[in-house]
Amino acid sequence: MVACVIKDWQGSEVGETALELRVAKAENAAHIVHRALRRQMANARQGTASTKTRAEVRGGGRKPWRQKGTGRARAGSNRSPLWRGGGVIFGPKPRDYSIKMNYKERRLALRTALISRSDSLIVVEDFSDKLPRPKTKELAAAIARWGVQPNDKVLLIVADKQDTIYLSARNIATVKLIQATSLNVFDLLNADWIVATVEALGKIQEVYGG
Protein backbone atom coordinates (compact mmCIF):
# COMPACT_ATOMS: atom_id res chain seq x y z
CA MET A 1 0.00 0.00 0.00
CA VAL A 2 1.21 3.49 -0.89
CA ALA A 3 0.07 6.49 1.17
CA CYS A 4 -0.36 9.70 -0.82
CA VAL A 5 -0.84 13.30 0.27
CA ILE A 6 -3.65 15.16 -1.51
CA LYS A 7 -2.98 18.72 -2.68
CA ASP A 8 -5.50 21.34 -3.68
CA TRP A 9 -5.37 23.78 -6.62
CA GLN A 10 -3.11 26.12 -4.64
CA GLY A 11 -0.65 23.36 -3.71
CA SER A 12 -1.65 23.08 -0.04
CA GLU A 13 -1.98 19.66 1.60
CA VAL A 14 -5.64 18.94 2.33
CA GLY A 15 -5.75 15.24 3.12
CA GLU A 16 -4.41 11.76 2.48
CA THR A 17 -5.37 8.76 0.39
CA ALA A 18 -3.91 5.36 -0.34
CA LEU A 19 -3.25 3.25 -3.40
CA GLU A 20 -3.22 -0.49 -2.91
CA LEU A 21 -2.24 -2.63 -5.88
CA ARG A 22 -0.83 -6.14 -6.13
CA VAL A 23 2.67 -5.97 -7.62
CA ALA A 24 5.32 -8.42 -8.80
CA LYS A 25 7.83 -9.91 -6.39
CA ALA A 26 10.99 -7.86 -5.95
CA GLU A 27 13.18 -10.39 -7.75
CA ASN A 28 10.88 -10.45 -10.81
CA ALA A 29 9.68 -6.84 -10.91
CA ALA A 30 12.37 -5.34 -13.16
CA HIS A 31 12.15 -8.24 -15.60
CA ILE A 32 8.38 -8.17 -16.05
CA VAL A 33 8.28 -4.36 -16.41
CA HIS A 34 11.09 -4.55 -18.97
CA ARG A 35 9.19 -7.17 -20.95
CA ALA A 36 6.05 -5.03 -20.95
CA LEU A 37 8.02 -1.98 -22.08
CA ARG A 38 9.67 -3.93 -24.91
CA ARG A 39 6.28 -5.23 -25.99
CA GLN A 40 4.69 -1.78 -26.03
CA MET A 41 7.53 -0.22 -28.03
CA ALA A 42 7.75 -3.14 -30.47
CA ASN A 43 3.99 -3.17 -31.04
CA ALA A 44 4.10 0.53 -31.87
CA ARG A 45 6.34 -0.13 -34.86
CA GLN A 46 4.62 -0.02 -38.23
CA GLY A 47 6.95 -2.56 -39.82
CA THR A 48 6.37 -1.14 -43.31
CA ALA A 49 9.99 -0.37 -44.26
CA SER A 50 10.73 -2.02 -47.60
CA THR A 51 13.53 -2.13 -50.18
CA LYS A 52 13.88 -3.83 -53.56
CA THR A 53 16.36 -6.58 -54.32
CA ARG A 54 18.15 -6.81 -57.66
CA ALA A 55 15.35 -9.07 -58.84
CA GLU A 56 12.69 -6.46 -58.05
CA VAL A 57 14.36 -3.27 -59.33
CA ARG A 58 13.07 -2.13 -62.72
CA GLY A 59 15.44 -2.80 -65.63
CA GLY A 60 18.78 -4.55 -65.66
CA GLY A 61 17.79 -7.44 -67.89
CA ARG A 62 20.43 -6.86 -70.57
CA LYS A 63 24.10 -7.54 -69.94
CA PRO A 64 25.80 -4.08 -70.02
CA TRP A 65 28.77 -5.23 -72.11
CA ARG A 66 30.27 -8.47 -73.34
CA GLN A 67 32.02 -10.74 -70.90
CA LYS A 68 35.53 -10.47 -72.28
CA GLY A 69 37.66 -8.19 -74.39
CA THR A 70 36.69 -4.74 -73.12
CA GLY A 71 39.18 -4.53 -70.27
CA ARG A 72 36.43 -3.68 -67.84
CA ALA A 73 35.25 -5.78 -64.94
CA ARG A 74 32.66 -8.33 -65.94
CA ALA A 75 29.04 -7.34 -65.29
CA GLY A 76 25.80 -9.19 -65.84
CA SER A 77 23.31 -6.47 -64.92
CA ASN A 78 23.28 -2.74 -64.29
CA ARG A 79 20.95 -3.38 -61.36
CA SER A 80 23.58 -5.27 -59.39
CA PRO A 81 23.88 -4.09 -55.75
CA LEU A 82 27.34 -2.79 -56.70
CA TRP A 83 25.83 -0.31 -59.15
CA ARG A 84 24.19 3.04 -58.50
CA GLY A 85 20.45 2.45 -58.85
CA GLY A 86 20.90 -1.25 -58.21
CA GLY A 87 19.08 -3.49 -55.78
CA VAL A 88 19.67 -3.60 -52.02
CA ILE A 89 21.34 -6.54 -50.32
CA PHE A 90 19.60 -7.76 -47.14
CA GLY A 91 17.43 -4.63 -46.91
CA PRO A 92 14.31 -4.45 -44.74
CA LYS A 93 11.05 -6.03 -45.83
CA PRO A 94 7.61 -5.51 -44.25
CA ARG A 95 7.38 -7.59 -41.09
CA ASP A 96 5.43 -7.89 -37.87
CA TYR A 97 7.46 -6.72 -34.87
CA SER A 98 4.72 -7.38 -32.31
CA ILE A 99 5.57 -9.28 -29.14
CA LYS A 100 2.99 -11.32 -27.27
CA MET A 101 2.54 -11.08 -23.52
CA ASN A 102 -0.14 -12.63 -21.37
CA TYR A 103 -2.94 -10.32 -20.22
CA LYS A 104 -2.34 -10.99 -16.53
CA GLU A 105 1.37 -10.32 -16.96
CA ARG A 106 0.67 -7.01 -18.69
CA ARG A 107 -1.61 -5.90 -15.87
CA LEU A 108 0.93 -6.98 -13.26
CA ALA A 109 3.68 -5.05 -15.06
CA LEU A 110 1.49 -1.94 -15.21
CA ARG A 111 0.70 -2.07 -11.49
CA THR A 112 4.34 -2.70 -10.65
CA ALA A 113 5.51 0.22 -12.81
CA LEU A 114 3.01 2.58 -11.16
CA ILE A 115 3.90 1.58 -7.60
CA SER A 116 7.61 1.85 -8.44
CA ARG A 117 7.03 5.53 -9.25
CA SER A 118 5.22 6.25 -5.98
CA ASP A 119 7.95 8.71 -4.90
CA SER A 120 7.15 10.79 -7.99
CA LEU A 121 3.37 10.58 -7.60
CA ILE A 122 1.44 13.77 -6.83
CA VAL A 123 -2.26 13.41 -6.00
CA VAL A 124 -4.46 16.48 -6.44
CA GLU A 125 -8.11 17.35 -5.97
CA ASP A 126 -10.30 17.50 -9.04
CA PHE A 127 -9.65 20.87 -10.64
CA SER A 128 -12.07 20.88 -13.57
CA ASP A 129 -14.12 23.59 -11.85
CA LYS A 130 -11.00 25.76 -11.69
CA LEU A 131 -10.82 25.79 -15.47
CA PRO A 132 -14.29 26.78 -16.73
CA ARG A 133 -12.58 27.61 -20.01
CA PRO A 134 -9.19 26.53 -21.40
CA LYS A 135 -6.33 28.43 -19.73
CA THR A 136 -2.87 27.03 -20.36
CA LYS A 137 -1.19 29.65 -18.17
CA GLU A 138 -3.33 28.79 -15.14
CA LEU A 139 -2.75 25.05 -15.49
CA ALA A 140 1.03 25.58 -15.87
CA ALA A 141 1.02 27.75 -12.73
CA ALA A 142 -0.91 25.08 -10.79
CA ILE A 143 1.53 22.37 -11.86
CA ALA A 144 4.39 24.55 -10.59
CA ARG A 145 2.57 25.02 -7.26
CA TRP A 146 2.32 21.25 -6.93
CA GLY A 147 6.13 21.09 -6.86
CA VAL A 148 7.03 20.35 -10.47
CA GLN A 149 10.08 22.07 -11.95
CA PRO A 150 9.60 23.96 -15.27
CA ASN A 151 11.39 21.48 -17.54
CA ASP A 152 10.25 18.28 -15.84
CA LYS A 153 8.11 15.88 -17.85
CA VAL A 154 4.66 15.43 -16.34
CA LEU A 155 2.13 12.65 -16.88
CA LEU A 156 -1.26 14.10 -15.95
CA ILE A 157 -3.87 11.42 -15.23
CA VAL A 158 -7.57 12.26 -15.07
CA ALA A 159 -10.58 10.00 -14.51
CA ASP A 160 -12.53 11.06 -17.60
CA LYS A 161 -11.88 13.16 -20.67
CA GLN A 162 -12.58 16.82 -20.03
CA ASP A 163 -12.19 19.24 -22.90
CA THR A 164 -11.12 22.25 -20.86
CA ILE A 165 -8.29 20.34 -19.19
CA TYR A 166 -7.26 18.77 -22.49
CA LEU A 167 -7.20 22.12 -24.29
CA SER A 168 -5.31 23.73 -21.40
CA ALA A 169 -2.66 21.00 -21.30
CA ARG A 170 -2.06 20.34 -24.98
CA ASN A 171 0.13 23.42 -25.51
CA ILE A 172 2.47 22.56 -22.63
CA ALA A 173 5.28 20.59 -24.25
CA THR A 174 6.31 18.80 -21.05
CA VAL A 175 2.79 17.65 -20.08
CA LYS A 176 1.06 14.55 -21.39
CA LEU A 177 -2.60 14.06 -20.47
CA ILE A 178 -4.16 10.59 -20.36
CA GLN A 179 -7.22 8.97 -18.84
CA ALA A 180 -6.89 6.52 -15.96
CA THR A 181 -8.08 3.68 -18.19
CA SER A 182 -5.29 4.39 -20.71
CA LEU A 183 -2.32 3.85 -18.42
CA ASN A 184 0.74 2.33 -20.06
CA VAL A 185 4.20 1.33 -18.90
CA PHE A 186 6.14 3.67 -21.20
CA ASP A 187 4.38 6.84 -20.05
CA LEU A 188 4.68 5.85 -16.39
CA LEU A 189 8.43 5.29 -16.69
CA ASN A 190 9.14 8.19 -19.04
CA ALA A 191 7.65 10.96 -16.88
CA ASP A 192 9.60 12.79 -14.19
CA TRP A 193 6.38 13.37 -12.25
CA ILE A 194 3.01 11.63 -12.26
CA VAL A 195 0.11 13.92 -11.32
CA ALA A 196 -3.21 12.16 -10.75
CA THR A 197 -6.54 13.45 -9.51
CA VAL A 198 -8.23 11.72 -6.57
CA GLU A 199 -10.94 10.49 -8.94
CA ALA A 200 -8.31 9.10 -11.32
CA LEU A 201 -6.63 7.26 -8.45
CA GLY A 202 -9.99 5.72 -7.55
CA LYS A 203 -10.53 4.68 -11.17
CA ILE A 204 -7.05 3.12 -11.26
CA GLN A 205 -7.83 1.20 -8.08
CA GLU A 206 -11.14 0.05 -9.56
CA VAL A 207 -9.81 -0.98 -12.98
CA TYR A 208 -6.40 -2.37 -12.10
CA GLY A 209 -6.88 -3.38 -8.48
CA GLY A 210 -7.89 -6.95 -9.22
Curated annotation (Swiss-Prot):
One of its GO terms (biological process) is translation. The keyword Coiled coil does not apply. Residues 41-79 are annotated as: Disordered. Keywords: Ribonucleoprotein, Ribosomal protein, RNA-binding, rRNA-binding. The keyword NADP does not apply. Residues 60-71 have a biased composition (Basic residues). InterPro entries: Ribosomal_uL4, Ribosomal_uL4-like, Ribosomal_uL4_dom_sf. Gene3D superfamilies: 3.40.1370.10. One of its GO terms (cellular component) is ribosome. Residues 43-52 have a biased composition (Polar residues). One of its GO terms (molecular function) is structural constituent of ribosome. One of the primary rRNA binding proteins, this protein initially binds near the 5'-end of the 23S rRNA. It is important during the early stages of 50S assembly. It makes multiple contacts with different domains of the 23S rRNA in the assembled 50S subunit and ribosome. Belongs to the universal ribosomal protein uL4 family. PANTHER family: 50S RIBOSOMAL PROTEIN L4 (PTHR10746), LARGE RIBOSOMAL SUBUNIT PROTEIN UL4C (PTHR10746:SF17). Part of the 50S ribosomal subunit. This is Large ribosomal subunit protein uL4.
